[in-house]
């Protein structure tokens, strides 16, 4: 699903292995490609899935290119209106339009199952951008939720997500008890000396700010 095939190679793969590739596989590949802004791949894969998925991906691709319209969203068949990729497209569009509060509420209502999201790390990127905008607006409580409720699966993305949640809790909410578990998860995920030292530093800062000095050890 992550392969960036050229059109001729894609045709060869479909010819040889098409019996093993159904609508679900083509739709998943299309969504993954759209998130990575590989528009040609996304639309070709969508076409293999059928006209309904093509309508869905046209809206998603347009949104990631800042060209989505209400008409494109309305053209998506009813069976796909609640698809996670369309939710992503709507959230992205709201954020780019600087409708940050609406984008945040839509994100909080979005699915969180990594399988449903297709590319949960790309969803984390969108969450991070929204959380930062919320901090600019002084809404640290919602920014914390946006960061803390991530579904990132990549180690680097998980570390960054847990850092953001912990940092917001510590620096903006003044809640070391809420911050400490996120810094602990950073340490659990860390795979390099640098990332581990960063996590332990912030665990120490949370402990220092805790009334009894023990939060980072939990």
Where does each model-flagged region fall?
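Alpha-helical solenoid repeat scaffolds
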Residues: 1-218
